[in-house]
Curated annotation (Swiss-Prot):
This is Retrovirus-related Pol polyprotein from transposon opus. One of its GO terms (biological process) is DNA transposition. It catalyses: DNA(n) + a 2'-deoxyribonucleoside 5'-triphosphate = DNA(n+1) + diphosphate. Pfam families: Integrase_H2C2 (PF17921), RT_RNaseH (PF17917), RVT_1 (PF00078). One of its GO terms (molecular function) is RNA-directed DNA polymerase activity. InterPro entries: DNA/RNA_pol_sf (IPR043502), Integrase_cat-core (IPR001584), Integrase_H2C2 (IPR041588), Retrovirus_Pol_polyprotein (IPR050951), Rev_trsase/Diguanyl_cyclase (IPR043128), RNaseH-like_sf (IPR012337), RNaseH_sf (IPR036397), RT_dom (IPR000477). Disulfide bonds: none annotated. Residues 752-910 form the Integrase catalytic domain. The keyword Transferase applies. Keywords: Endonuclease, Hydrolase, Nuclease, Nucleotidyltransferase, Protease, RNA-directed DNA polymerase, Transferase, Transposable element. CDD domains: RNase_HI_RT_Ty3, RT_LTR.
Length: 1003
């Protein structure tokens, strides 16, 4: 408190004899004196910012402990009680260091240090940008300030980021200001994200419901108050024309800067957040329900900030207000509204001329969409412009892509601006009262309004709406209405989860019964389970009463002039919207148009203005065609004609002149809403003779040899006959030219057949030639035990193959069956004679069907995975050594089929009992393994055969078309014709002696 005033020539010893007035403050302990702007003018003194001193006369300098520019007048609103200013001054006087100039030698006391974790150890260097010559002085000035404040220091770091100069908001006198910024774009791309959560703005605002008084505190140079971790300081390096520097404090522009600062401020105010204040990065709001409590709450927050040596910008702070600006909103005791300054900036924006400007406008308005009733509807013409060709445009290029608003989009642009300017105040939620959630859905959007009863008046808390995607547009009406409820509950979860009663109002009465136990719709059942998380009471509200939510979901479609044009009076439109149920405005009620000719419908109504009398004919059996005269008379004649000719069970085709479409639509909507009707304007020739049909199909097919679907569409332009698709498919399926030269678009997928299961190890052996690191190996795997072995092979010559095969069969004790692919070396007489001498059956996989020999192919895949990992872990080992190690690792690992190690099964290492026990144990083990193999095979085949068919059977002499897989050119035949000699269920043997898998045959 000021006790008295002193006036005198206090600076006379320094050469200035001006009378100076000082006010005595006994509680001022941080300084000997504070000089204001008027005193500086009287002294004609100069503040030397660089040297932090006051120059009274040339040669006389006074060191300054602090310097600041503070506008004291707006700290309090005028309507506060008497004495409030004195209480505030006293409170601020308790914490003088909080309001000292930025970074005046103090260190923030917090456990949080700013670090930059990157996914690479390589220094990130970006070339400097050339900035304007006339800005060099400004850059040097700002560099000097940062050096003086201890924010940066000279650097010799290998890292580098460029700087740029951007304009700031001008001073009140119009003087331009600039800010030096560092572009950390390249550093940010390699920075590991800090996942610390930033508070949800809507949840924060919703929690201020019972408060009456507010104080907002703005932290001075927020990020610069946090020290950088010493090891990460070099990463912040940047260069200018006069040197290179690095940040000692957290700079602006780093990817993780907001999360780091939020962690720091949460650490400092942890005990008070949610009780007396909320924090969003460097913005703090202190709240209370009454005047006296507010001083206590404010003192607690200031004490915590003072203890941590954080500094507050007094100019941007507001104390003890009933209405404050916070996070772009105006927070009052009555509720929340949009910030008029932000709204004014939006209202003054010109129409966008580029994609970037359009997205910027939509982003700004979307921030306030909770205030805009029916935002999805109003903004839809603009959001449509960001899709299609403009959807994948990069942000850096969006400013170069021009865009033009049509009349509808321009109207949407102006409507959004005008609605924002007149938006109402949204109420705070009261969590002790029931919530009202009113929802509605249309064919293109869903919407809802959350409200509560306030003294007999239903006050809105939030408006929400969104457009439906393509999948959701195909939902049934009841599913769309349920989706509106589910989406609204999820979107408003911060308000509704754990709340008391939630009354959900819908204008779709069947929905109130769909939540019962007799509902068999799986999708609705799943959604019902999600609704049960909330304490909901579903209430039917007729469309007349459900105006707001109904409007949120109404985005009127373009009806192509099929209905009467609405008057350009928005009041009339809203009046009709408020007094009619949403279903009556639904475009899905209009009779759809189709491209097919009227001939395809079994009941055809052809209206003709030139016809004088009615005629009924039957172009085909089961088809009826009504030729009806149409005159410009009353609606009764047209209604009577439709009543007598329409059939309620089947789809009716109608051909009517476009001039009478509107009349026809209105009659159908009023009298025939449940009938299936399609409108078309096409009539083609009927073809009934079998020979004529075959000739037409043959002529069209030979023209381009297209498929049945294309031929049908082509013929429908001129002709129609019943069962067109099946007739065309049957006739074209026998075309030899198509079978030989066309691709097989739907290849055969015969069911996978079970393969023989061995009873013991070494009964069935799979072999293949395997190349690795310029060496050949004979790969062998026992089908029973899954034990594998690689034998070195000198070449694929039959003599070398026979030598290696002898070694392998000796190791595996001559199996009963040997499975291999079509390796030529195995077909030579010497190898075949050797196998016959050992009584070994050789089974060949069909040509180019290596998957039939899948046991060894699957082993190769697993072996290569192990080999590559070993090669990385043991770089000094030779490839041959790695091969042996990899095979050993495979054999000593548990196999997923047998649940045992292949080596244990193959060598029976697990048996360590007496002879009799060994035999019984061995027998039981083999039976268990066989059962596992059989089970895995059956289960695998069942899963893979879901989309496959039973193999087609062929008799001796049947023609089959075999794929020419060896052909490398595209102009030759894709298939060749062969005759079947023997059908082996999954393969066929042709008269040429070759075996083909049935998946290689044309359907």
């Amino acid at each position: 408190m000021i006790t008295h005033r002193l006036v005198g020539k206090f600076f006379k010893p320094l050469g200035n004899d001006s009378d100076i007035t000082f006010f005595v403050l006994p509680n001022l302990h941080s300084f000997d004196g504070i000089i204001g702007d008027d005193t500086l003018k009287d002294l004609k003194a100069i503040v030397d910012r660089k040297n932090n001193c006051l120059i009274i006369t040339p040669g006389i300098k006074i060191p300054l402990l602090a310097r600041a520019s503070i506008n004291v007048n707006p700290l309090l609103a005028a309507e506060h009680p008497d004495g409030t200013q004195e209480i505030l001054n006293s409170l601020l006087g308790e914490f003088p260091r909080i309001f000292e100039p930025p970074l005046s030698g103090m260190s923030v006391e917090t456990a949080v240090k700013a670090e930059i974790r990157t996914n690479t150890q390589d220094p990130i260097y970006a070339k400097s940008y050339p900035y304007p010559v006339n800005m060099r002085g400004e850059v040097e000035r700002q560099i000097d300030e940062l050096l003086q404040d201890g924010i940066i220091r000279p650097s010799n770091s290998p890292y580098n980021s460029p700087i740029w100069i951007v304009p700031k908001k001008p001073k009140p006198n119009g003087e331009k200001q600039y800010r030096m910024v560092v572009d950390f774009k390249r550093l940010n791309t390699v920075t590991i994200p800090d996942t610390y959560p930033i508070p949800d703005i809507n949840a924060t605002l919703a929690s201020l419901g019972n408060a009456k008084y507010f104080t907002t505190l703005d932290l001075t140079s927020g990020f610069h108050q946090i020290h950088m971790k010493e090891s990460d300081i070099p990463k912040t390096a940047f260069s200018t024309l006069n040197g290179k520097y690095e940040f000692l404090r957290l700079p602006f522009g780093l990817k993780n800067a907001p999360a780091i600062f939020q962690r720091m401020i949460d650490d400092i105010l942890r005990e008070h957040i949610g009780k007396v204040c909320y924090v969003y990065i460097d913005d703090i709001i202190v709240f209370s329900e009454d005047y006296d409590t507010h001083w206590k709450n404010l003192r607690l927050v200031l004490a915590s900030l003072s203890k941590a040596n954080l500094q507050v910008n007094l100019e941007k702070s507001h104390f003890l207000d009933t209405q404050v600006e916070f996070l772009g909103y105006i927070v009052t005791a009555d509720g929340i509204k949009a910030d008029p300054k932000k709204v004014r900036a939006i209202s003054e924006m010109p129409p966008p001329t580029s994609v970037k400007e359009l997205k910027r406008f939509l982003g700004m308005t979307s921030y306030y969409r909770k205030f805009i009733q029916d935002y999805a509807k109003v903004a839809k013409p603009l959001t449509n412009l960001t899709r299609g060709l403009y959807a994948n445009i990069k942000s850096s290029q969006s400013s170069k892509v021009p865009i033009t608003l049509d009349e509808t989009a321009l109207q949407s642009f102006n409507d959004l601006k005008s609605i924002l300017c007149s938006s109402e105040i949204l109420a705070f939620p009261c969590f002790t009262k029931p919530f009202h959630l009113t929802t509605d859905a249309s064919n293109w959007a869903i919407g809802a309004v959350l409200s509560q009863d306030d003294q007999g008046r239903d006050r809105p808390i939030a408006y929400i709406s969104r457009s439906l995607n393509k999948t959701e547009e195909n939902y049934a009406t009841i599913e769309k209405e349920m989706l509106a409820i589910i989406w609204s509950l999820d979107n408003l979860r911060a308000y509704l989860y754990g709340a008391g009663t939630i009354k959900v109002y819908t204008d779709h009465q069947p929905l109130t019964f769909a939540l019962g136990n007799r509902n068999f719709n799986a999708k609705l059942k799943r959604w019902k389970a999600r609704i049960e998380e909330y304490n909901c009471e579903l209430i039917y509200k007729p469309g007349k009463s459900n105006v707001v939510a109904d409007a949120l979901s109404r985005i009127p479609p373009q009806l192509n002039q099929l209905s009467t044009d609405l008057d350009a009076n928005p009041e009339d439109d809203m009046q009709s919207l408020a007094t009619a149920h949403s279903a009556l405005h639904d475009s899905s009620r209009l009779i759809p148009h189709v491209e097919s000719p009227i001939n395809v419908f079994k009941n055809q109504l052809i209206f003709d203005t030139t016809r004088s009398k009615y005629l009924c004919e039957h172009p085909f059996p089961g088809y009826t065609r009504h030729l009806i005269p149409l005159k410009d008379g009353s609606l009764a004649d047209l209604t009577n004609s439709l009543q007598s000719c329409l059939r309620p069970v089947i789809i009716n085709g109608v051909k009517i002149p476009e001039a009478h479409l509107q009349r026809f639509q209105s009659i159908c909507l009023a009298n025939f809403l449940l009938y299936k009707i399609r409108i078309t304007q096409r009539l083609v020739a009927d073809v009934s003779g079998a020979e004529e049909i075959c000739e037409i199909i043959e002529k069209e097919h030979r023209r381009a040899h297209r498929g049945p679907t294309e031929i049908r569409l082509q013929l429908l332009e001129k002709y129609y006959f019943p069962r067109m698709s099946s007739t065309i498919r049957l006739q074209t399926s026998s075309c030899q030219c198509c079978k030989l030269y066309k691709y097989e678009r739907h290849p055969n997928k015969p069911n996978l057949q079970p393969t023989p299961i061995p009873n013991y190890p070494c009964e069935i052996l799979h072999i293949d030639i395997f190349a690795l690191e310029k060496r050949l190996y004979l790969s062998c795997i026992d089908k029973f035990s899954k034990f594998a072995k690689l034998f070195h092979l000198q070449s694929k010559a039959s003599v070398h193959l026979r030598e290696t095969l002898v070694e392998a069969l000796h190791y595996f004790t001559a199996p009963k069956v040997l499975v291999s692919d079509n390796e030529r070396g195995l077909l030579c007489p010497t190898v075949l004679n050797y196998l016959r001498s050992l009584d070994i059956d050789l089974y060949y996989a069909p040509t180019q069907k290596s998957e039939v020999n899948g046991q060894v192919e699957r082993f190769h895949s697993t072996f290569l995975e192990i080999y590559r990992c070993l090669k990385d872990e043991l770089p000094t080992f030779k490839p041959v050594e790695l091969v042996h190690i990899a095979v050993d690792r495979y054999n000593t690992s548990v196999h997923s089929v047998t649940n045992r190690k292949p080596a244990d099964v193959f060598f029976d290492r697990s048996s360590r009992v007496n002879y009799q026990g060994l035999t019984d144990f061995r027998r039981q083990t083999l039976e268990d393994i066989k059962g596992l193999i059989e089970y895995k095979q059956i289960r695998g085949n069942m899963a893979r055969n879901k989309n496959r068919d039973e193999p087609k059977s062929y008799g001796p002499g049947d023609e089959v078309f075999v794929a020419n897989k060896q052909i490398k050119t595209k102009e030759k035949a894709r298939f060749r014709c062969e005759k079947v000699q023997e059908d082996n269920k999954i393969t066929v043997k042709t008269r040429s002696g070759k075996i083909f898998h049935k998946s290689d045959l044309r359907n």
